[in-house]
């Protein structure tokens, strides 16, 4: 499982850089794990160059061939050591890559890895809500291989659906949108607009995510106040700023002059890691510098017990609500995944024996709301309460742009990553 987590987390940073490179002044919120799982489904049925390109872009060619033989349920002791052992795990992963070849030859190996990882994350869902609405919809003219359909259900906990794009594309569109809306508890509507699907559509990959969790230490709504959020030297915005004092794991990244704070969700199964550059005249450049240097290995090091320690922290953190939709075809093509989108080159014969099947469209849509109780809770604000005199506090004042990651702690998987430029 460690090597799949590493692959997914590496893809997280590759993907984030790709979607953020053209605009430093926009909010971003994506679920790279969900997208990796979605394309893992496609990879299960891809062959030849189509498979190789997916393996390269999503780092699936770096998976260990031995891990899937290990027991599915790690001991509590091994879970508690997950964070600090991850760095060593990455070294072992890298060392084994030469023996694994350039591509994952056994496509079911990937399914085994994802089956274990998704089952492990599902096991903790009593503490939070995470719905990764991944599903393939194929034109009914292309019969789906029964073995592929069974593998998708077993490993990825979803289904492949046949619809009539050719004769009734509008009904198919409505069916897809209804399913996504139901999976996201009504938060994600109209995944596909009226012009998005037509009678030429043959295969659609649906990828939508809904997340809800409560903070381990909730913010008191009485301490939420209107405050300035500095977008840059000349521009500010008034936001609802939440405030609390308590013991949190916090550290400082010398090379970037940035703070890193861990705020846990209920029961500690998930954490939000917030990376906050020091306030400067040009907050955008400070954030861009952080985005250039951050990667999977560095985040592991920065968030390890060697860098983070529990201290009394005075936190000021803005409420924010992010919803975004990404048409991923051009983004993924720029990352090297080209053939599956090309009718003349795609080899998806593991999905359907028809040689004409190709991926028509993939859209990634996410929604997150952060407030006093966590995500997706009712917001409230009021008067600041008087604070008693307390020992020296480390200040963490997120009143300017920052990055954040939501991590599943037992597996070290990055579920979400985001940039808050303007709350």
From Swiss-Prot:
Keywords, alphabetical: Cytoplasm, Protease inhibitor, Serine protease inhibitor
Subcellular location: Cytoplasm
Keyword Cytoplasm: yes
InterPro entries: Serpin_CS, Serpin_dom, Serpin_fam, Serpin_sf, Serpin_sf_1, Serpin_sf_2
Signal peptide bounds: none
GO cellular component assignments: cornified envelope; cytoplasm; extracellular space
CDD domains attached to this UniProt entry: serpinB12_yukopin (cd19571)
GO BP terms: hematopoietic progenitor cell differentiation
Residues the UniProt record annotates as site (Reactive bond): 388-389
Cited SUPFAM superfamilies: Serpins
GO terms for MF: serine-type endopeptidase inhibitor activity
Composition skew (Polar residues), residue ranges: 75-106
Annotated region (Disordered), positions in chain: 63-106
Basic and acidic residues bias: start-end ranges: 63-72
Predominant localisation class: cytoplasm
Subunit structure and binding partners: Interacts with SLFN12; as part of a pathway regulating cell differentiation.
Function: Inhibits trypsin and plasmin, but not thrombin, coagulation factor Xa, or urokinase-type plasminogen activator. May play a role in cell differentiation.
Family: Belongs to the serpin family. Ov-serpin subfamily.
Protein name: Serpin B12
Organism: Mus musculus (Mouse)
Lineage of producing organism: Eukaryota, Metazoa, Chordata, Craniata, Vertebrata
């Amino acid at each position: 499982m460690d090597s799949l987590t590493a692959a997914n987390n590496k893809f997280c940073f590759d993907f984030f850089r790709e979607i953020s490179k053209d605009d430093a002044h926009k909010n971003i919120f994506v679920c790279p794990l969900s997208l990796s799982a979605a394309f893992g489904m496609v990879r299960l049925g891809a062959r030849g160059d189509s498979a190789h390109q997916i393996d390269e872009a999503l780092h699936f060619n770096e998976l260990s061939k031995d891990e899937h033989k290990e027991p599915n349920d790690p001991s509590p002791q091994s879970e508690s050591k997950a964070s600090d052992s991850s760095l060593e795990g990455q070294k072992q992963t890298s060392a084994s890559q030469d023996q694994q070849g350039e591509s994952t030859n056994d496509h079911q190996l990937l399914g085994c890895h994802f089956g274990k990882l998704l089952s492990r994350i599902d096991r903790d869902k009593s503490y939070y809500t995470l719905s990764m609405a991944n599903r393939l919809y194929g034109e009914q003219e292309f019969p789906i291989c029964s073995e592929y359909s069974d593998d998708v259900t077993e490993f990825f906990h979803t289904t492949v659906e046949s619809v009539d794009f050719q004769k009734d594309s509008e009904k198919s569109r409505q069916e897809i949108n209804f399913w996504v809306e139901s999976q996201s508890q009504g938060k994600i509507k109209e995944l596909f607009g009226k012009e998005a699907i037509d009678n030429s559509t043959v295969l659609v990959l649906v990828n939508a995510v809904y997340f809800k969790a409560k903070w381990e230490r909730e913010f008191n709504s009485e301490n939420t106040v209107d405050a300035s959020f500095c977008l840059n030297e000349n521009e500010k915005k008034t936001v609802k700023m939440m405030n609390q004092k308590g013991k949190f794991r916090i550290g400082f990244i010398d090379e970037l002059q940035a703070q890193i704070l861990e705020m846990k969700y209920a029961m500690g199964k998930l954490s939000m890691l917030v990376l906050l550059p020091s306030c400067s005249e040009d907050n955008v450049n400070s954030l861009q510098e952080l985005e250039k240097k951050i990667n999977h290995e560095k985040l592991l090091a920065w968030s390890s017990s060697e860098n983070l320690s529990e201290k009394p922290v005075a936190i000021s953190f803005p409420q924010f609500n992010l919803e975004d939709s990404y048409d991923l075809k051009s983004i993924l093509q720029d990352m090297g995944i080209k053939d599956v989108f090309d009718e003349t080159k795609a080899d998806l014969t593991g999905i359907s024996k028809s040689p004409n099947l190709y991926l028509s469209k993939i859209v990634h849509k996410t929604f997150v709301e952060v407030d006093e109780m966590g995500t997706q809770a009712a917001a409230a604000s009021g008067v600041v309460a008087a604070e008693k005199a307390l020992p020296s506090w480390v200040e963490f004042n997120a009143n300017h742009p920052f990055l954040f990651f939501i991590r599943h702690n037992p597996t070290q998987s990055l579920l979400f990553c985001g940039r808050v430029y303007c709350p």
